[in-house]
């Protein structure tokens, strides 16, 4: 198969033989990933696979295998539309398409094309099955959207997109096509140029504009991954939004848009994006290993309310760190298989009782237990739904696009998976920070961890499928990107936040129209309502001044004059400087300034948010200082 033919090597894992067979390099058609790795650097990968094979032979119990359902015709697209929040366009739940018009009207042309493509497939499938469901033609809905855009002032959408993108173009491509040297060189010895990542324009639109403006085929990224471009986020005056900063109702909209955007990006670049679905199976609902993350967290939260990362996972990491991260071969050298099996059984029996003797756990054993925990999750840490999409990242032409896809995939992960992945990546970075002593470079760590993340024990794949599933160098490179760019991956792109703001504004208008109709029916004084509505926001605050509420601080409210340079950190500093008594112990980082209401549900502001710029973007917001919810 195509993927197999482009690999440096493959391994077999038959019952008869446990030897790893590394095939010769194919002379042609090497993928991006293979160009960036030499054969020596693959050794850690194959050794790790052999260690996994041995440890699975000593596994303490047979785990029930997750069945990954092969979807019927049209079923994949139907599921996709549900995940994208558009299930009311078809089927038994089909209702007034007006409900989706607000959502669809905020989409870019590439996002709209992705939705249209899936609706047409579902529509054809349902017609074949002779189902009498009313399926609105999405082209009609988008026609309304186009009409409203044509009448809007300020030029067309694609014009503004291109204008906005021009300032970033060239720099991205230059950095994406860096050619590295033969051997692995630590990044700090070869400083790669810093390149701004454009978060203001849809990623799929950027890819399409690049395709349209370039007559030649986009050159694929090459180069040793040690010289990956150093991408950075340009400062956004309205503040950078990170995962965890938004209220749940807005985060739900972000996830819908992230799925549509990811699909649009893969469509534009001609990469197949297949979501998978796990059939529900009976899993353990207590214990430590082979337990779903959500079940683990439920039992942990009974002990420690608000816990977001499994206690056993945290304890294994802290045990490794207690012995110092300078140990040579950390993560690479396995613990003895029999000892690991015994430790697993002992942990299951004693961990929650608090009687387990952690002093008896050697550092390499703790590292092996950590990797075992990840592998034995009933569903992969990267989720059944998106595991293949994470793998397909290696097929995107440029490093910039690979980073953009990973950003959207991280947003799409369930909360428990995303939080645990973040804790893992932060730990791996700390290991790499000690590479001079432990001899574990970012590439070594990526090689060792890739099979543990991408080869989920519970998926129970046959050896032939498994060879295709693991895709050696490709998954190692995806792992490397996750580690290197982790600080960027937990950012919500500005264009998506702006789409959420637009949706909220349109929904408010719709609600207001409904309210006016209702008031008219009730023979209410409509004028009085409109007058009230108009004056609520300018109540007692003069122009150019915001009123900041701080219900839990001694100074509960303050009017603050907006200036060009006023930042969120300045507002916080003014409040905290006036604290006395108990509240004086409040430190920076314990309370945050929030933007609440207007065109957003709730958003925690980063310190560098320029308040005047944000006020202009959301003049109807309230400004509140409070701590982050657990």
Regions found by a protein language model. Give the residues of each.
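Conserved, well-structured core segments
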Residues: 310-312, 364-372, 480-481, 558-560
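Intrinsically disordered regulatory linkers and targeting segments
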Residues: 1-358, 447, 451-535, 541, ...
